[in-house]
Curated annotation (Swiss-Prot):
GO molecular function, one term: toxin activity
One of the record's GO cellular component terms: extracellular region
Record remark on domains: The cysteine framework is C-C.
Keyword Disulfide bond tagged: yes
Main subcellular location: secreted
Keyword Disulfide bond: yes
S-S bridge residues: 1-6
Official protein name in the record: Conopressin-T
Free-text function comment from the UniProt entry: Interacts with high affinity with oxytocin receptor (OXTR) (Ki=108 nM) and vasopressin V1a receptor (V1aR/AVPR1A) (Ki=319 nM). Acts as a partial agonist on OXTR (Kact=37 nM, 22% of oxytocin maximum activity at 10 uM), and as a full antagonist on V1aR (Kinact=329 nM).
Site (Important residue for antagonist activity on V1aR/AVPR1A (a Gly in this position produces agonist activity)): residue numbering on this chain: 9
Residues modified as Valine amide: 9
């Protein structure tokens, strides 16, 4: 993931 809050790929 490329987001600040991501719990997946």
């Amino acid at each position: 993931c490329y987001i600040q809050n991501c719990l997946r790929v």
